[in-house]
């Protein structure tokens, strides 16, 4: 096991072979990397019951330090995150959505806002919200060094024909900057959990996973509660589970891969995209904290209006056809995945026959 120790403390202790130093025991390594600490491996350690109120830690370990077990941590990397927001007539929620991003403590990101032919004022409100953010940034502008000039954070793309969320996200890929490392999806009626959401994401990206599954919360009747924390142990559990687009951060090269693009012109577009992403990923990590808030109070959301939306029934049929196509594409490559897709085909076919949707 590897744990962290402050470098200055090490310098004090290493001259005395009999000297012990206290080490953080239950802090994630990713959290400590940002502090530019060093770490060491240990063999014989004992628990020390002491309350370190300054660090909010109740239990720490102590260990003898030697030069042999001294290891330097890898450099902390600030990955650029491309946040994709599809929008259609969400003038009442888009400001809250964008504000939750602009207030982030982690700032190495860009937003691709793709409007799917809205007829309301959502584009105007998005521009006004961004302008308000820019004015705040300019208030801290350093006229001498010019080091504080805010970078462009928001790109607005207006579609010329209706493509729904899947098409909007595919279009967004074409507008991502070349230096974007990962993509994350935020719906225009939802928002990020708190101001450290992107910081938490970047800490977990230090191991360079293809996919990072994140925790979700839901907002309903004025209350926010945690509703989904990923617990996948392997690729098969991830495929068999279901994480909507907003439940994962994906390496840009994987998300934009031809085989992993969204189906367009249909609802439920993220179900098969999830399967494809999980099939082609080589590694993943879990962030067992809420990062995203799913707004279940929104009367216009897809899942809320599914019973009266004429697209819902046709999308169930389309989903069955897309699942069949996915099964035929992947069949024979992995026996466990074959069985999962076969059972999924049966389930979706039953949905078509019963005009229902058991997944919801």
How would you name each of these model-derived features?
Residues 338-360:
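Non-catalytic, C-terminal membrane-associated alpha-helical segments of glycosyltransferases
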Residues 1-10, 17-46, 52-318, 329-332:
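Nucleotide-sugar donor-binding/catalytic module of glycosyltransferases
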Residues 331-339:
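Acidic, serine/threonine- and proline-rich low-complexity regulatory regions
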